[in-house]
Amino acid sequence: MKGFYLTLIISILLFSGCYRYDEPEPADEGKIIVLMYHRITSGEATNLYERSIENLKKDFEYFKKHNINVISFNDLAEIKVSGKMPAGNSAILTFDDGDNSWFSLVQPLLKEYRYKATFFLWVYMIGRNSFIGWDDVEQMSYYTLEGGVHPFIFGSHSFSHAYLNADRSKFQDLNEYNRFLDYEFGESKRIIEEHIPGKVEVFALPFGDGAGDENIISAAERNGYKFIRTSSQSAIDIPDQDFFQIPAIPVLDNTQSDAIGNYLGI
């Protein structure tokens, strides 16, 4: 009888040692995209670069439905340092120029969804015409979530919204050209930093002009920037992405929310 139990125990041990339990498959690594918005309207958009608040909300609902994380450029830097993409897809929301709809329409919706966003200011125009005012910029930039996180980040869209590369021939020499670049990068940064907590570290190229140009990248670096957002349309390539050539996808009046998913493989 003892021999029977001994044989049974040995058989169980051998079986359990040989049996291979299926381990759960690791979650697929997601993709990251940057979305580029401009003016948001309360009614129907009147030109290609506008988007209605109704369609912006549809975009946000699309993010929720497909579990798309909304992150910041600083989050992107942390992901690159880690060398590993997070599970699930992510998007960085950006808004160009400085329309006052950012304060009246965009800010409340972002707060409702608890989303982060980066706003690129055309500095010369702030407080003029239909552009946002500095008081509103300050109110948005100082708003915090739990833990002191500032979800609304302000970057530079240059001082004068000039072509940074296409008009290069009008300068007499490289020194004059570099002085122009330093003003567009440096003066806009200085003025914005008078109204926000922290530093201005993200720049969006006006018209997408000059992406990858070494003089423009050098000007960004010496003026304290860590990121340049371009208008090249693709997903971000981690870990090989050059942060001075970050692609972005324009979201226009006629963009369908589900078209965003095409860049994420949805």
Task: Identify what each model region corresponds to.
Residues 18-90, 244-252, 261-262, 266:
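N-terminal pre-catalytic segment of deacetylase/amide-hydrolase enzymes
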Residues 68, 115, 225:
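Short phosphate-binding/catalytic loops that engage adenosine nucleotides
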Residues 1-4:
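Positively charged n-region of N-terminal signal peptides that target proteins for export
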Residues 30, 35-43, 89-91, 99-101, ...:
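Metal-dependent polysaccharide deacetylase catalytic core of the NodB/CE4 family, i.e.
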